[in-house]
């Protein structure tokens, strides 16, 4: 996912001042949207999912914006259990994701990221050749 996002051609890379969101199924990016507002970007993906009857159960969601409670709630409404952001996670976003049983990753850059909730979904003995995960305890 992170490698796909790093290679993604984007307005942000060319001009800045926009947020990007993507929907993934495994390692495959299904949709990528950029907008000046992170809420607009996630709403575009939610609308696409609704229009095409796409279930979020086996999907993951990536955003360049902060993971606030609003972003976590929108992902939950989409049925997406795993959320990844290259930025940070707010306390309310973290608490809501934990209550909803979602997996929340923040500060995802290169091959390193923080797992705030839902670490039990992943191998506790990561392959040293793969991404490094640090679990954050509440």
Where do the protein language model's features map onto the residues?
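Conserved catalytic-core subdomain
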Residues: 72-138
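Conserved mixed alpha/beta catalytic, RNA-binding, or beta-rich assembly cores of soluble enzyme
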Residues: 1-66, 71-73
């Amino acid at each position: 996912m992170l490698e796909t996002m790093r290679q993604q051609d984007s307005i942000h890379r060319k001009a800045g001042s926009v947020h990007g969101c993507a929907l993934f199924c495994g390692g495959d990016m299904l949709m990528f949207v950029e907008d000046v507002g992170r809420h607009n970007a996630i709403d575009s993906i939610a609308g696409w999912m609704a229009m095409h009857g796409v279930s979020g159960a086996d999907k993951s969601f990536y955003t360049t914006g902060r993971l606030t409670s609003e972003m976590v709630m929108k992902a939950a409404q989409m049925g997406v259990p795993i959320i990844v952001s290259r930025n940070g996670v707010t306390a309310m976003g973290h608490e809501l994701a934990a209550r909803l049983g979602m997996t929340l990753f923040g500060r995802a850059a290169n091959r390193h990221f923080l797992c705030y909730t839902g670490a039990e979904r992943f191998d506790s003995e990561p392959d040293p050749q793969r991404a490094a995960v640090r679990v954050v305890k509440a």
